[in-house]
């Protein structure tokens, strides 16, 4: 996952690597295949008959090789963070292309958001899980499935934010120094978020905790975590764009 801890020092290399620099693809795959498996494992809940875990693994490995070719110097210390963005992005793009969230699933996710919002207004606070389940007229398992569906569309948000910022600054061309510039901008923006939002994003993207694990750590309900996650990403996007 993205390492969201700011770098203490940074020295620009004397020579900037170009994306066309030949790479040892076998060494690249051997060195980072565990990272690909870790990304696939985090996204495994979205595997379908149209895109299995094995398919996701293959997509991730191809994206890893493409990331190496584009970046140039796979020995650069900043390459792993760049590669994670590309691997996650490639898998999520394919999942979206295959319409991995069915119309019914999307409708259920919207219904969950609507019910949560209405209960929050009527109660004057965030509703508990049991209150939402009762309002939906469903069971606990369906409720958790709906939460996963609601959160699924945001899984790539932080990675996509970083990629979009890079594209807008450098026209889609990457090297170690340029990618580090974006990483430093992201670190600076993260540092301007509240301590709670920083912790939430760190737990989600760096430590790969799921929604309910983060809720336990922060002593909040899963719906509140979803809300805070969305707000934090919106604020982060504004800070990165300013």
From Swiss-Prot:
SUPFAM superfamilies: Sigma2 domain of RNA polymerase sigma factors, Sigma3 and sigma4 domains of RNA polymerase sigma factors. Gene3D superfamilies: 1.10.1740.10, 1.20.140.160. One of its GO terms (molecular function) is DNA-directed RNA polymerase activity. Keywords: DNA-binding, Sigma factor, Transcription, Transcription regulation. It comes from the Bacteria. GO terms for biological process: DNA-templated transcription initiation. A motif (Polymerase core binding) lies at residues 55-68. InterPro entries: RNA_pol_sigma-70_dom (IPR014284), RNA_pol_sigma70 (IPR000943), RNA_pol_sigma70_r2 (IPR007627), RNA_pol_sigma70_r4 (IPR007630), RNA_pol_sigma_FliA_WhiG (IPR012845), RNA_pol_sigma_r2 (IPR013325), RNA_pol_sigma_r3/r4-like (IPR013324). Induction: Under conditions in which the polar flagellum is not functional. Residues 211-230 bind DNA. NCBIfam families: FliA_WhiG, PRK06986.1, sigma70-ECF. Belongs to the sigma-70 factor family. Sigma factors are initiation factors that promote the attachment of RNA polymerase to specific initiation sites and are then released. This alternative sigma factor is specific for the flagellin gene (fliC) expression. This is RNA polymerase sigma factor for flagellar operon.
């Amino acid at each position: 996952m993205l390492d969201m801890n700011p770098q203490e020092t940074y020295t620009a290399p004397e020579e900037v690597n170009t994306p066309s620099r030949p790479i040892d693809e076998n060494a690249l795959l051997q060195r980072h295949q565990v990272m690909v498996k870790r990304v696939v494992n985090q996204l495994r809940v979205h595997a379908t008959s149209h895109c299995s875990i094995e398919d996701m693994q293959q997509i991730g490995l191809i994206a890893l090789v493409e990331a190496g070719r584009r970046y140039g110097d796979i020995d650069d210390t900043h390459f792993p963070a760049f590669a994670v963005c590309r691997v996650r992005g490639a898998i999520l793009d394919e999942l979206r292309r295959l319409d991995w969230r069915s119309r019914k699933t999307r409708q259920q996710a919207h219904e969950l958001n609507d019910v949560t919002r209405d209960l929050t207004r009527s109660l004057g606070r965030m509703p508990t899980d049991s209150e939402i389940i009762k309002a939906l007229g469903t069971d606990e398992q369906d409720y958790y499935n709906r939460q996963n569906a609601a959160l699924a569309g945001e899984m790539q948000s932080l990675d996509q934010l970083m990629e979009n910022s890079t594209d807008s600054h450098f026209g889609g061309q990457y090297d170690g120094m340029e990618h580090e510039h974006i990483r430093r901008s992201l670190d600076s923006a993260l540092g301007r978020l509240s301590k709670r939002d920083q912790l939430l994003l760190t737990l989600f993207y760096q430590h790969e905790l799921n929604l309910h694990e983060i809720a336990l750590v922060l002593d909040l309900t899963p719906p509140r975590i979803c809300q805070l996650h969305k707000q934090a990403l919106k604020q982060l996007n504004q800070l990165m764009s300013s």
